[in-house]
């Protein structure tokens, strides 16, 4: 990793930790009656290194994001390892990346990444990777062939064909739309970008000026959007981290504040009370709730915008019941068909599993 990227990541983590300490604290709310939240370690022995093998003896080098395919295979963006790891059949292996710094396309074990920061599994079997410091979106087929899907490696802003489109360094979330289009949080450009199945990049929401403005997608403003997802009705939810809230974009193209007070903190409660400080990722459960990683906590947001903390409290490492469990920069999330939640616990170099019983 380039030294400037190391400094950037360190500064980011410091800022997150500081924000957490400064924000007002809300007590953890208990899980719903009849539901117990259990946190366990699913993969990784906690060593900051690279080693394939059985789940609990495998090693990761800052696992930053996680995705699950339609056939139940887990994929992990091993950020500082510059690899995409695969978890299947109780074993951890490499899908793509040779561990060296670069942007080379090709077969899995010869391809290279700069900073594989975000990962998303598409229904047809492709894996999309946000190579953030390289300003590219990469695609990996099920057989492990890596190609550049959009972006040139030059940081900037430009819509158009995927071969000439430009993104800024530090891209955030990625989501797959119902028509197969790819949506990207172009965080430092303050925009949500759309990559159509036909290979055209356009601006879906946001503009050059950054701030907080609701309204049509063409006039709306965001400040460091970092995670996106769609619900079953086609609404997009955006973690607008610079504004410390979650925004909602309807299929009609209207942007509004969904929940959060725009004040940094960890308070639980309704849309006008709840606080956030840094949402890394969001997933949707079968009941339509948003599950999100926010600081050292895993939180739930109901369809009405009510926020509660279901696991985690202070920084550390501990399995157990939700409120007693500890994480160290829980980042990417993925949910399986049984409702189990998988967490890329980045600074603990582990993949954690949250079961609801």
Where are the language model's segments positioned?
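Structural signal for beta-propeller blades
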Residues: 82-85, 135-137, 190-192, 244-246, ...
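Bacterial Sec-dependent N-terminal signal peptides
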Residues: 1-40
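Blade-level signature of beta-propeller repeat domains, shared across WD40, Kelch, NHL, RCC1
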Residues: 329-357
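Conserved beta-propeller blade signature
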Residues: 73-75, 126-128, 181-183, 235-237, ...
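Residue-level detector of Asp-centered blade-edge/turn motifs that repeat once per structural unit
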Residues: 68-71, 121-124, 176-179, 230-233, ...
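Short loop/turn segments immediately following the C-termini of beta-strands
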Residues: 79, 132-133, 187-188, 241-242, ...
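Short loop/turn segments that connect beta-strands within beta-propeller blades
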Residues: 87-91, 140-145, 195-200, 249-254, ...
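Gly/Pro-rich loop segments of beta-rich domains
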Residues: 34-64, 91-117, 145-172, 200-224, ...
